[in-house]
Amino acid sequence: DYMFYFQGEIMSQKAVKRLYLMQVGSMPEYQIPIVCYLVQTEDGKNILIDSGLPEIIPEEGSDFENGQDVIEQLASLGLKPGDIDTVISTHYDLDHAGRHAAFTKAQYVVQRGHHLDAASNPRYAATRPQWDQPMDRIRLVDGDTELLPGLELIETSGHVPGHQSVLVWLPKTGAILLTVDAVPFSEGFTRDEQDDGSNPDAEAIRASTIKLLDLVEREHIGLVMFGHDQEQWETFKKAPEFYE
């Protein structure tokens, strides 16, 4: 079957080997998990997606609670902070960029629009020491970007300007979409109008949601992981287990 052969050829060129899921904290009152992801490539690269909460949570983050942080979880996989080659920043919120500075050898990858907005936005002031790194260590991307074969960044503004979701292609599992905060809960993954008009970013959120729904249909994505969905999260394999 030529088509099957051809698809096999395409899949064999994908560089991603494993995906680990780590819960690094929570919002106990709302039963919401705070999570990071680790992608390992066939050629031994370690790519972290987000870094969780800061070690010391500032006052405005009083709803958050640290669990086993990203550094401890990586250690349980035999990895030190210096082993991380790349940190993908989905966005600079407190619960996503709180440990960026620990990864002293990594290149940070972020949407240009988000990084530029963050510079003057008080929302990201608390995490600024984490994400405000020398520019030679930051790779700014513009819109949807294939970072490497099997790892794609999907621009999904709305939750914040320049938010990005991540599409991972695994050899056995196939495609997994990490929506992150573009769609934090499964019930939000719908084409229906959801907002009562009170959210100024409702239109952008809706556009990004529809963009991801279209992507899932077009690429036949079998698994969509929402950013903060406790019920769904409980069904997943967590590190040290992995998806491959």
What do the PLM-derived regions correspond to, one by one?
Residues M3-G61, K211, R218, T235-E244:
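Zn-dependent metallo-beta-lactamase
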Residues R18, K45, T86, A106, ...:
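The start of beta-strands in P-loop NTPase/AAA+ ATPase cores
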Residues Y20-M22, I47, I88, V109, ...:
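Hydrophobic/aromatic beta-strand patches that form the interior of the parallel beta-sheet core
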Residues E29-I32, S157-P161:
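A short catalytic or substrate-binding loop motif that flags glycine-/basic-rich loops and adjacent residues
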Residues P54-I57, Q68-L79, D83-D95, Q107-E155, P161-K238:
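Metallo-beta-lactamase
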Residues H100-T104, L170:
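Short, conserved loop/helix-junction motifs that constitute active-site signature segments
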